Design a protein with these regions (language model features):
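Extracytoplasmic gating/loop element in the C-terminal half of outer-membrane beta-barrel translocons
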Residues: 282, 313, 367-455, 459-460
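Flexible, surface-exposed loop regions and adjacent strand-edge segments
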Residues: 1, 42-50, 82-88, 129-138, ...
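Surface-exposed, low-complexity loop segments enriched in small/polar and acidic residues
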Residues: 1-11, 25-27, 37-39, 44-46, ...
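Solvent-exposed loop/turn elements at secondary-structure boundaries
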Residues: 102-171, 188-231
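Short loop/turn motifs that connect adjacent beta-strands in outer-membrane beta-barrel proteins
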Residues: 19-26, 62, 96-110, 127, ...
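Surface-exposed extracellular loop regions of Gram-negative outer-membrane beta-barrel proteins
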Residues: 8-35, 46-99, 171-174, 182-189, ...
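Conserved small-residue
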Residues: 128, 229, 243-341, 468
């Protein structure tokens, strides 16, 4: 059958610009916008209404101030919580226009600025595909078996508790910026230090509620949806460019870098398992202590039957972190950053050389500080699956002193195939991401044609990887 999708949108904008006494520069902007989208088969229309104001002022192109304020409305929240204000403020100082730098032959431009904002957003207010009425409780009914044959009883139970105080997710940002140009743009630099915090992500099964408020069968819960989890990103980024003409060749070398730490707030039963203060892309698993060498060593070690099967010599030995003489999920710890939200430090280097109608361009990228886990079918050879070359270094009685891979078995080998530091490797790498040579045909060839220009180029991508784990990464 057919479906209907209707979107109505409105936007209006008012701008103001003026200069007073040649030194006071003022501009302002007022924006109103809204939209409503309705789809067949969906009860609730997707609506948004926003009003924003921005005012900018600078004195003699030296001192800058910018203030913004957005008023937003969201139908995803309960009445009384659907409106919010999102302010922002930026302050800047252009040092180049001060008397002590105005006539400098070294500094072309130099500016420092600081900015901060608190943004209320509802984009992430969702539980699965459900975005509306998350603040309401849900009750439902079902049938179950009665106490006597041939009958069933109807019962009513809660699926979710009520929370009419559910609020917007807040994005708090603070940044300090520095920009400069030196020696007639021979060197340019743009650097920033930033702190970004996302506060109030939704959770529906918080660990600080008693477990009896949530049951597995029937799937009942009195727990409401709460604003609870917080994510924080702290770091710096920079971009430096060097531009020089050497004879007939125009050279440009650029270097960019980003370093950041991402952290989460979350509670767990064991304190060392708390995600609070740990990386958002953290790898969690077991600490290994080598391979078991004998039955006597297994008997003298904490019980590892949690993973199933029988532990034998050649299996991975794990560390009993909480000291309860057994290995289970409560012995998992933070092992390192996975780099899924970006490596702790990323680097980019680009080189451009222009000579007559030829242009040479090369781009190199690097990422450092993250870890990976060797957990695909090449490394985790289970049961009678096809073996890879890595198992040549497996544990046997003859190779126990040099083995780098656990024993082989056609039975349950789950003990060995758990996320642990035994399988981890550094993903540090520098890659020659792109090389391109371009030739621009002379413009004189197109003076009497409809063509404005024509270029031909040859390029290559991912031509080289420099890494201690190059074979794994490739």
């Amino acid at each position: 059958g057919s479906t209907d999708n209707q979107t109505m949108f409105f936007s209006g904008q008012f701008n103001y610009n003026n200069t007073f006494n040649d030194v006071h520069n003022l501009s302002a902007m007022l924006i109103a916008s809204g939209f409503q989208q309705s789809k067949s088969g969906q009860y609730h229309k997707n609506s948004s209404a926003n009003l924003a104001f921005d005012a900018s002022y600078n004195y003699a192109q030296k001192y800058y101030a910018d203030f913004g304020l957005a008023a937003i409305h969201s139908a995803q929240l309960a009445p009384g919580h659907r409106e919010a204000l999102s302010p922002s403020l930026s302050l800047g100082w252009r040092l180049k226009n001060e008397s002590f730098l105005k006539n400098s032959k070294v500094v072309d431009d130099m500016m420092i600025s600081v900015s901060g904002s608190i943004i209320n957003e509802d984009i992430d207010l969702a539980s699965g595909d459900n975005r509306y009425y998350l603040y309401q409780s849900i009750w439902t009914s079902d049938y179950g078996y009665g106490w006597y044959d041939g009958s069933s009883d109807k019962y009513t139970y809660s699926k979710r508790g009520e929370n009419k105080d559910l609020d917007f997710i807040k994005r708090k940002e603070l940044s300090l910026n520095f920009k400069t140009s030196l020696w007639q743009r021979l060197v340019t630099l743009d650097a920033s230090f930033f702190i970004n915090s996302m506060e109030g992500y939704l959770i529906s099964s918080p660990t600080f509620y008693p477990s009896h408020l949530n049951t597995g069968y029937p799937s009942a819960s009195f727990m409401p949806v709460l604003n609870y989890n917080n994510n924080r990103r702290v770091g710096f980024d920079f971009a430096a460019n060097f531009n020089k003409k050497v004879g007939d060749v125009d050279l440009s070398l650029g270097v960019t870098g980003t370093s950041k730490a991402t952290k989460r707030d979350e509670n767990n039963v064991e304190q060392y398992q708390n995600r609070q203060g740990k990386a958002l892309d953290g790898i969690w698993g077991y600490k290994s202590a080598g391979l078991f060498q004998s039955e006597e060593e297994i008997k003298a070690s904490p019980d590892q039957s949690y993973f199933g099967g029988t532990v034998k010599p050649g299996d991975i030995k794990y560390v009993d972190v909480n000291g309860d003489n057994k290995i289970d999920q409560y012995d998992q710890v933070f092992l390192g950053k996975g780099g899924w939200y970006g490596a702790p430090f990323t680097l980019g280097v680009n080189l451009t050389a222009k000579w007559k109608n030829f242009t040479f361009f090369a781009l190199g990228t690097g990422n450092f500080g993250a870890w990976g886990v060797k957990n695909n079918s090449y490394w985790w050879v289970k049961g009678d699956s096809k073996y890879s070359a890595v198992v040549r270094n497996r544990w046997t009685e003859e190779t126990k002193e040099t083995a780098t891979y656990p024993r082989l078995t056609t039975l349950n080998g789950n003990n060995n195939f758990q996320t642990s530091d035994f399988w981890m490797y550094k993903t540090d790498a520098f890659r020659l991401a792109k090389v391109q040579i371009t030739y621009d045909l002379p413009s004189t060839l197109f003076q009497k044609t409809w063509l404005k220009g024509l270029s031909a180029y040859v390029s290559g991508a991912n031509l080289l990887t420099i890494s201690g784990e190059r074979e794994v990464l490739e």
